[in-house]
């Protein structure tokens, strides 16, 4: 489903290199210190940044040099990037057609996704008229209408209060299960990571320092947990 082989990218003085294999339907939490390369990893997969060397395979096809629009991925950021002058329906519709000229099938897809994220009553409203949680639901819906098999999340819920963050995690679990999505989520919240993903990557200085069970890392039973500021039981 997703394979990175010696994928290399230079950021200022830091040379980042990623080797990674992910099966279809896996959920991966991406952890690590600020500036370690977590967002860069997602941007390389999405095509927003270009690797100097190495290869990137998505869904069995080589996407090392393809444009973001050609890649089978959708990406959601911490900032929802909704257009303030467009209604929620129009914002979500942009995921289907940049000119908002939707055919009947696309309109049906939009309605199905909107129902799944419980935003039926919000469609005619502007983003400013919604709560923070509703805006993130709308941003997630815009990703989902594209119906891509790989979902990339870059700290999407960090600005939400605990109740809203929990609400979004419940929704995310449901969506990933129903659609069998492959998920990679950057997070600084260890509880969120353990809840949403069985497998975790710990990124340090542009390299994968740990690739294993999330619960093992969060429990502090491996020495790599010290990088996250945790006391470890490892000798």
Curated annotation (Swiss-Prot):
Entry's family note: Belongs to the ABC transporter superfamily. Thiamine importer (TC 3.A.1.19.1) family.
Matching Gene3D superfamilies: P-loop containing nucleotide triphosphate hydrolases
Source organism, top-level taxon: Bacteria
Gene Ontology molecular function, alphabetical: ABC-type thiamine transporter activity; ATP binding; ATP hydrolysis activity
Membrane topology summary: Peripheral membrane protein
Protein name per the record: Thiamine import ATP-binding protein ThiQ
Subcellular location: Cell inner membrane
Enzyme Commission number(s): 7.6.2.15
Subunit structure as annotated in this protein's UniProt entry: The complex is composed of two ATP-binding proteins (ThiQ), two transmembrane proteins (ThiP) and a solute-binding protein (ThiB).
GO cellular component, one term: plasma membrane
Catalytic activity as recorded in UniProt: thiamine(out) + ATP + H2O = thiamine(in) + ADP + phosphate + H(+)
């Amino acid at each position: 489903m997703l394979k990175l082989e010696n994928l290399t990218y230079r950021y200022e003085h830091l040379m980042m290199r990623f080797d990674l294999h992910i099966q279809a339907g896996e959920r991966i939490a991406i952890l690590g210190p600020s500036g370690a390369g977590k967002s860069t990893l997602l941007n390389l997969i999405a095509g927003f940044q270009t690797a100097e060397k190495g290869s990137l395979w998505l869904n069995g096809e080589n996407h090392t040099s393809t444009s973001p629009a050609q890649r089978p991925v959708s990406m959601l950021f911490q900032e929802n990037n909704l257009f303030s002058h467009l209604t929620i329906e129009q914002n979500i519709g942009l995921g289907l057609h940049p000119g908002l000229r939707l055919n009947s099938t696309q309109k049906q897809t939009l309605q199905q996704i909107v129902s799944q994220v419980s935003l039926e009553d919000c469609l005619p409203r502007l983003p400013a008229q919604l709560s923070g949680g509703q805006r993130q639901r709308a941003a997630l819906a815009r990703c989902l209408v594209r119906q891509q098999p790989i979902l990339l999340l870059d700290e999407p819920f960090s600005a939400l209060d605990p109740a809203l963050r929990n609400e979004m995690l419940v929704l995310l679990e449901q969506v990933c299960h129903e659609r069998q999505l492959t998920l990679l989520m950057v997070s600084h919240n260890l509880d969120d990571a353990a809840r949403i993903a069985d497998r975790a990557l710990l990124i340090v200085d542009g390299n994968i320092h740990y690739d294993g069970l999330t619960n093992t890392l969060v429990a502090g039973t491996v020495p790599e947990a010290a990088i996250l500021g945790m006391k470890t039981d490892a000798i």
